[in-house]
């Protein structure tokens, strides 16, 4: 059970919500603020004074006054008309994050929503009745309207859900959770719809996956150093301290620890080789830059996870209703775009190491890592697959945040495209996962070919894990299942756990 304290969510809590079947409860300390916000809205609605989002239309229709007896219909119509998403359902982990983030934002007491509505969301979450939310349809301003409308429609008994993973109607979902359809009061539909929770949830969910891939890449890169008989001297702490970038310093320390005591490395300490190619030698510089970007993105996304991104905002202490633009997800878009760059570079560097290993001139290993080359092609086309995936990532890494299209009759004339920026991270991460799987296989093959010498004590379990699933490549065979089984292990963090490094979300 995780206690949600609005405005004080942590990265470990968010990772746990996404990855584990934890339940939620709202911190009782937030109740007074929530109730005060709801009362402030009720008072404004009762007076009939024009206030955006409470008794007016929305967007370009903001100047249209809505009579008191139509306020409930206004909120219902808002939710139903905005539920226009398309595409595949959002991943379960992302929906769980979305709901938790929405509860945190509402729980700060500036949205004017009743606890009854929030309790219904928590009940659905804890019953594992999750809204079916199409993943496409948001431009990231005014908030993530379409995705959040699909979440909200379930509270009205409209739309679809997943009940413990099985697709069903919203009414069936409410029944399983012991709930009845709600009637939303003034502003409550808008409070549910307005916000950056979809883009932030997608960005966080994919960031956690990319963090795991980063750690796996450290392990794969270190194993490739041994496979290629590379030097550990470029990882000397003194080099990296002189430059001063913390990510680079930390990455170099990881490589030193992973390669400590490697018999392969000790076997060629006195060779006449002067310098390794950049894909080996400059790993701390490249991976360190990725790490710095990822840490910055995590900082930004944690702030956004705790933010109130509704509009308008209710200030119960003064009774004011202030319209602003906290729904504009530009910070999320930038963070997601930076994560895309980092994840793509992780894969790009791994692809270059695969290319190095299969090149006999550079690695000193048999061509394409197989004996009797010619009749056997070995890792030749596995590298082509890695190259295809790395190239695809370069296109996917194009920043989404530089794009904008005006919407709502030019009232909303600049948007963030944060949801797409966050969503495409999943494709980049999946490509990078498979590149790393191919590298792990290639590096393990190279280490085998260095016999009688072995890799380091830290990397020995990695070799054991790989060889427990995939045998040494002796002769050409149907290769795709080998890649698939190692990619599955990458996704399960089997190799990430070996890295002597952790992110803030894992602490």
Curated annotation (Swiss-Prot):
Q: Where is this cross-link: 5-imidazolinone (Ala-Gly)?
A: 141-143
Task: Name its pathway.
Answer: Amino-acid degradation; L-histidine degradation into L-glutamate; N-formimidoyl-L-glutamate from L-histidine: step 1/3
- Name of this protein: Histidine ammonia-lyase
Q: What class of enzyme is it?
A: lyase
> Which SUPFAM superfamilies does UniProt cross-reference here?
L-aspartase-like (SSF48557)
Keywords annotated in UniProt: Cytoplasm, Histidine metabolism, Lyase
> InterPro entries of this UniProt entry?
Aromatic_Lyase, Fumarase/histidase_N, HutH, L-Aspartase-like, Phe/His_NH3-lyase_AS
Chain's gene name: hutH
Please tell me where this protein is predominantly located: cytoplasm
Q: Which domain of life is it from?
A: Bacteria
What Pfam families does the database record attribute to this sequence? Lyase_aromatic
Which EC number applies?
Answer: 4.3.1.3
- Biological process per Gene Ontology, one example term: L-histidine catabolic process to glutamate and formamide
Keyword Cytoplasm appears in the UniProt entry: yes
What protein family is recorded?
A: Belongs to the PAL/histidase family.
Q: Which residues carry this modification: 2,3-didehydroalanine (Ser)?
A: 142
Reproduce the UniProt comment on modification after translation.
Answer: Contains an active site 4-methylidene-imidazol-5-one (MIO), which is formed autocatalytically by cyclization and dehydration of residues Ala-Ser-Gly.
The record's GO molecular-function terms, alphabetically, read: histidine ammonia-lyase activity
Transmembrane segment boundaries: none
């Amino acid at each position: 059970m995780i206690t949600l304290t609005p405005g004080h969510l942590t990265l470990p809590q968010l990772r746990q919500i996404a990855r584990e079947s934890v339940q939620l409860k709202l911190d009782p300390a937030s109740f007074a603020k929530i109730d005060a916000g709801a009362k402030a809205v009720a008072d404004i609605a009762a007076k009939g004074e024009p206030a955006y989002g409470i008794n007016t239309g929305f967007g370009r229709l903001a100047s249209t006054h809505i009579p008191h007896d139509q306020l409930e219909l206004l909120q219902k119509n808002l939710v139903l008309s905005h539920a226009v998403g398309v595409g595949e359902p959002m991943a379960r982990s992302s929906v769980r994050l979305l709901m938790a983030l929405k509860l945190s934002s509402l729980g700060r007491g500036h949205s004017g929503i009743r606890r009854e509505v929030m309790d219904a969301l928590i009940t659905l979450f804890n019953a594992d009745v999750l809204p079916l939310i199409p993943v496409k349809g948001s431009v990231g301003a005014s908030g993530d309207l379409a995705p959040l409308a699909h979440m909200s429609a379930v509270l009205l008994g409209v739309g679809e859900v997943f009940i413990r993973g099985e697709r069903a109607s919203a009414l069936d979902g409410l029944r399983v959770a012991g709930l009845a359809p709600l009637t939303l009061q003034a502003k409550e539909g808008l409070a549910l719809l307005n916000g950056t929770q979809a883009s932030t949830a997608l960005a966080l969910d994919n960031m956690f996956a990319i963090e795991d891939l980063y750690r796996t890449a450290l392990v794969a890169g270190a194993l490739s150093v041994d496979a290629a008989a590379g030097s550990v001297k470029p990882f000397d702490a003194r080099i990296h301290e002189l430059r001063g970038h913390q990510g680079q310093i930390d990455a170099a320390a990881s490589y030193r620890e992973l390669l400590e005591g490697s018999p392969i490395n000790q076997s060629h300490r006195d060779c006449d080789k002067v310098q390794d190619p950049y894909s080996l030698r400059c790993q701390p510089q490249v991976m360190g830059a990725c790490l710095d970007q990822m840490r910055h993105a995590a900082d930004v996304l944690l702030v956004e996870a705790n933010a109130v991104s509704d509009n308008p905002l209710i200030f119960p202490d003064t009774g004011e209703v202030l319209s602003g633009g906290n729904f504009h997800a530009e910070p999320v878009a930038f963070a997601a775009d930076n994560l895309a760059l980092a994840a793509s570079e992780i894969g790009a560097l791994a692809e270059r190491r695969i290319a190095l290993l299969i090149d006999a001139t550079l690695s000193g290993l048999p061509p394409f890592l197989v004996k009797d080359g010619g009749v056997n092609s070995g890792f030749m086309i596995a590298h082509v697959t890695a190259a295809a995936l790395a190239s695809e990532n370069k296109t996917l890494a194009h920043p989404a945040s530089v794009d904008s299209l005006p919407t709502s009759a030019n009232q909303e004339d600049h948007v963030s495209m944060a949801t797409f920026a966050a969503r495409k991270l999943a494709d980049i991460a999946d490509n990078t996962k498979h590149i790393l799987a191919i590298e792990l296989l290639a590096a393990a093959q190279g280490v085998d070919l260095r016999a009688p010498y072995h890799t380091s004590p830290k990397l020995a379990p990695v070799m054991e894990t790989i060889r427990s699933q995939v045998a040494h490549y002796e002769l050409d065979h149907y290769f795709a299942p080998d890649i698939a089984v190692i990619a599955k292990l990458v996704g399960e963090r089997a190799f990430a756990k070996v890295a002597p490094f952790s992110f803030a979300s894992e602490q």
